[in-house]
């Protein structure tokens, strides 16, 4: 981000990226929320203290699977499902998250996927002859044939807590990056005979991450366009929707 500010504290529509995610999660009424911090941990924890989340630190950062490993002690085995979200994917909605959680009922692993014209950097969804999900292969580990796949993993999943805890604690780092990949739990689920379901995101806007000022600006515009369209559909007259910036929640009467 070319900034001293931790990435998840950069703002979109006047609210930090992380707060957008926490608000979406709060809409599900979770038993509790665990936030895994790394770079700028103290600053992130201070900024989000009012959320009531439990904070655990990932030191050092050894991959997405390693991150979830740090949260395992804070996950009560009485919690039927664990939903994994990303602090830099701010526009995920409560509705989509709820659908994903519902999809993993009956001891399934549920993945949120999307098809992208340019899938660079994303893990590819590998399906078997019958169409079922068999694995996720990270971009850096993918062959040219696998990189041609456009269906990708968004980084968001839901799974029965006991199964997820067992899988992540069994991860290894035998890969190009020498990291513990959360995506490896898919192959573990398949090996255990646990069904893996892939739920398509309603739009790529919900699942795009922020890794640069350019991407942040793009999501800001997408978000504001969504707000403008919602207001127009509610009957609000906007002379130029492209020049609207909404902060917080806006309630309008008729003939505004």
Which residue ranges define each predicted feature?
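Conserved N-terminal catalytic core of the sugar/cofactor nucleotidyltransferase
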Residues: 11, 15-102
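N-terminal nucleotide-binding beta1-loop-alpha1 segment
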Residues: 1-4
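Short aromatic/basic micro-patch
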Residues: 11, 91, 158, 209-210
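Structural beta-sheet core signal
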Residues: 34-35, 83-84, 109-112, 198
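Conserved core of the sugar-phosphate nucleotidyltransferase
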Residues: 42, 92-176, 183, 194, ...
């Amino acid at each position: 981000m070319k900034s001293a500010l931790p990435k998840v504290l950069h703002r979109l529509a006047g609210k930090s990226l992380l707060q957008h995610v926490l608000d979406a999660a709060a809409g599900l009424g979770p038993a509790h929320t665990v936030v895994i911090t790394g770079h700028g941990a103290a600053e992130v924890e201070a900024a989000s203290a009012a959320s009531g989340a439990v904070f655990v630190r990932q030191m050092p950062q050894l991959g997405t699977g390693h991150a979830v490993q740090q949260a395992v002690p804070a996950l009560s085995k009485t919690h039927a499902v664990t939903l994994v979200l990303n602090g830099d994917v701010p526009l995920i909605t409560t509705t989509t998250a709820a659908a994903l959680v519902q999809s993993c009922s009956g001891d399934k692993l549920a993945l949120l996927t999307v098809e992208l014209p340019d899938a660079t950097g994303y893990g590819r969804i590998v399906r078997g002859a019958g169409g079922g999900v068999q694995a996720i292969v990270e971009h850096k580990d993918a062959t040219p044939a696998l990189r041609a796949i456009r269906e990708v993993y968004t980084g968001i999943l839901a799974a029965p807590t006991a199964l997820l805890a067992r899988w992540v604690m069994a991860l290894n780092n035998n890969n190009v990056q020498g990291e513990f990949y959360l995506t490896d739990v898919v192959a573990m689920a398949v090996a255990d005979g646990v069904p893996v379901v892939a739920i398509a995101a309603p739009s790529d806007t919900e699942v795009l991450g922020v890794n640069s000022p350019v991407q942040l600006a793009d999501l800001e515009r997408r978000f504001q366009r969504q707000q403008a369209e919602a207001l127009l559909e509610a009957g609000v007259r906007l002379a130029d929707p492209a020049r609207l910036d909404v902060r917080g929640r806006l309630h309008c009467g008729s003939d505004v």
